[in-house]
A protein has these predicted regions:
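Short amphipathic alpha-helix that is part of the acyltransferase structural core
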Residues: 1-33, 151
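Hydrophobic adenine-recognition pocket in adenosine-nucleotide-binding enzymes
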Residues: 67, 80-82
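Conserved acetyl-CoA pyrophosphate-binding loop and the N-cap/start of the following alpha-helix
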Residues: 86, 90-98
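Conserved catalytic-core motifs of GNAT/GCN5-like acyltransferases
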Residues: 110, 114-116, 126, 131-150
Length: 151
């Protein structure tokens, strides 16, 4: 069913419990409550997709996306997610269009705007001017171990 018209994009980001649930529902890696609260507090800009007719907190948030960074030199597009039962309707593109508009209005011309594309999502991001950087540069990840962890 195509219910794009029943979905509202709002310039706000879900609370930590909703964020954590949506990450799991969309196949993103799980985050602890502490990590979610800290991270969301540092969002520069974020959007949520809300399904009309749903009770808040009962599956109403069906998508999200946000921008993090230092607000001047580096911006990172993160947490682009649409619930699986709503994928394939252009909702990811709506999220990216909102983030792209915000970046165009707020990122200085010399800023570096980046993201990590999972699988075929790179095709969506290419529509907004993102290009693969390999082999000139590659993405690397560091897994934080936190206080008290042993190596």
């Amino acid at each position: 069913m195509n219910d794009v018209g029943l979905v509202e994009l709002v310039e706000s980001f879900p609370d930590a419990p909703t964020y954590r649930r949506l990450r799991i529902e969309t196949g993103l890696s799980p985050k602890s409550q502490e990590a979610a609260e800290r991270g969301l507090a540092n969002t520069l800009y974020g959007v949520s997709l809300l399904k009309a007719g749903e009770v808040i907190g009962m599956g109403r948030v069906i998508g999200m996306g946000r921008v993090v960074g230092d607000g001047g030199t580096v911006f990172v597009v993160v947490d682009i997610a649409v619930r699986r039962d709503h994928q394939g309707q252009g909702l990811g593109k709506r999220i990216m269009a909102a983030l792209d508009a915000w970046l165009r209005a707020n990122a200085p011309p010399s800023a570096y705007v980046m993201l990590i594309a999972d699988g075929d999502a790179r095709h969506l991001y290419a529509q907004f001017g993102f290009a693969e950087t390999a082999p000139a540069s590659i993405s690397m990840a560091y897994v934080a171990r936190g206080p008290g962890s042993s190596d």
